[in-house]
């Protein structure tokens, strides 16, 4: 389309009609207008200074790097060369795998390649030379190998790195993949899933994906640059996809005759509806997928919400696909304490070692005390706590656990604002370092803010879940 016609299409319909009446040719009705935004700007000095990334959220972007066009990168996350966790992180990941395995659930880990690995060709030469791509790729592949040795099914996504494709894998100014990136990832993941025992027994049907519209992305990296530099970047538009069963479009039956899906997807906002990752998985696997991921869920949000659901407790999947990025630390003890508790539904249906209920008032509230009816043996290494608020919208638990020797643990659990909560917080008592033999004395909970309604809550202590394992494993760095 020539420049004259582009100008014509950008005019008001009245002006365009008048010009057309004067003999100016119209563009073909089937041909959509094209738009091109010039690159916005260069980063200001403030964006290069890590001290300016002050909040916890801002620190996820430390520090921005200008690349070609409107591309931005983050030095700590996108251009990382290390992919690893602590010995405690490996131990917990192994325990989690074994617990799922004991319940007949096979876990597939989708460990995203970084934007630096995939799109280093967008960097300016000076930054590209500083980024050790070979080291990053080697360490990324080594991490995939460590997941695999722990027993996880791990798609090798390294063929996606350093790619030269017509459609961007990642957005220029955002950490999320585009629908095209999700599509290319899903194709590789599906090939791994097909090798998982039990996949052959899962009901199959054909799916097809098609472009269903356009999405505009105001990038998180672009937004951060705007906060630091006062700049404003153009919205990046991208095709959006919908996946439907072949021959069943619009029938209103999400899962057709296949019943409840036996494959579930948990993960970050990358697995959200906008990018159609679950849809592409269905297309390439030929099987239904229950997608429980939601925006803002992070590493654990959708996993915890799913584990506590009736869907999981009554109908656990044969295959659970867990998608996350190297951004997240894998040694966050509080996350595993919750997962291991919820895997067998916390204290639900189990005898209570100690229990109580009360109405919380503002400030500190004593809820459980070991000794009111005789001292009980409540060692951390063999017990868990299940707390339920009547108000299901409660998303934050602040508690202090006291022990017989005067020691205490301050515990704060925050659920994502975007999650569908049930007011429940179940977790194992702490057992890392030297905590396993601590004897629980009391549980205190912070009540609601002053001026708000009192909150009813109940708490139960019970024996923690015991998951059978074929052998005792010690997972550590360098597996």
Locate the predicted segments by residue.
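Bacterial N-terminal signal peptides
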Residues: 10-21
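Intrinsic disorder/low-complexity segments
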Residues: 7-10, 344
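Extracellular glycan-modifying ectodomains
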Residues: 2, 26-479
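N-terminal secretory signal peptides that target proteins for export/translocation
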Residues: 1-7
């Amino acid at each position: 389309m020539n420049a004259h016609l582009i100008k014509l299409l950008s005019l008001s319909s009245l002006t365009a009609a008048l010009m057309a009446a004067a003999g100016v040719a119209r563009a073909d009705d089937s041909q959509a207008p094209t738009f091109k935004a010039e690159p916005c700007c260069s980063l200001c000095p403030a964006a290069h200074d890590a001290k300016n990334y002050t909040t916890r959220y801002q620190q996820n972007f430390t520090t921005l790097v200008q690349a070609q066009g409107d591309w931005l990168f983050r030095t700590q996350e996108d251009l990382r060369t290390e992919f690893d966790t602590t010995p405690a992180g490996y131990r917990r990941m192994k325990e989690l795998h074994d617990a799922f395995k004991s319940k007949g659930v096979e876990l597939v880990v989708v460990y995203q390649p970084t934007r630096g690995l995939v799109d280093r060709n967008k960097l300016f030469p000076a930054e590209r030379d500083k980024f050790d791509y070979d080291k990053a790729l080697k360490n990324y592949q080594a991490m995939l190998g460590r997941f695999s040795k722990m027993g996880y099914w791990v798609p090798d996504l390294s063929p996606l790195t350093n790619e030269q494709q017509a459609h961007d894998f990642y957005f220029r100014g955002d950490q999320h993949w585009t629908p095209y990136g999700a599509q290319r990832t899903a194709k590789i993941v599906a090939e791994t899933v097909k090798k998982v025992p039990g996949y052959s027994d899962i009901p199959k049907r054909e799916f097809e994906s098609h472009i269903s519209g356009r999405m505009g992305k105001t990038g998180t990296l672009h937004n951060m640059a705007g906060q630091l530099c006062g700049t404003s970047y153009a919205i990046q538009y991208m095709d959006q996809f919908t996946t439907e069963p072949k021959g069943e479009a619009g029938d209103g039956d999400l899962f057709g005759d296949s019943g409840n899906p036996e494959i579930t997807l948990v993960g970050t906002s990358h697995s959200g509806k906008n990018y159609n990752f679950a849809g592409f998985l269905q297309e390439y696997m030929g099987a239904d997928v229950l997608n429980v991921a939601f925006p803002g869920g992070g590493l654990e949000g959708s996993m915890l919400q799913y584990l506590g659901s009736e869907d999981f407790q009554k109908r656990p999947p044969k295959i659970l696909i867990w998608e996350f990025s190297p951004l997240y630390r894998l040694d966050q003890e509080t996350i595993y304490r919750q997962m291991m508790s919820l895997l067998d539904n916390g204290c639900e249906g189990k005898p209570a070692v100690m229990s109580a209920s009360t109405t919380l008032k503002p400030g500190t509230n004593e809820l459980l005390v070991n000794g009111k009816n005789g001292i009980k043996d409540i060692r951390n290494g063999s017990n868990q706590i299940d707390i339920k608020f009547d108000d299901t919208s409660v998303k934050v638990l602040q508690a202090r656990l006291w022990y017989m020797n005067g020691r205490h643990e301050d515990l704060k659990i925050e659920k994502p604002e975007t999650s569908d909560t049930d007011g429940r917080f179940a977790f194992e008592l702490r057992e890392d370092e030297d905590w396993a033999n601590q004897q629980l004395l009391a549980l205190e909970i912070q009540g609601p803010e002053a001026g708000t309604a009192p909150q009813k809550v109940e708490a139960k202590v019970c024996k923690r879940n015991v998951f059978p394992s074929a052998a005792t494993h010690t997972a550590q760095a360098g597996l």
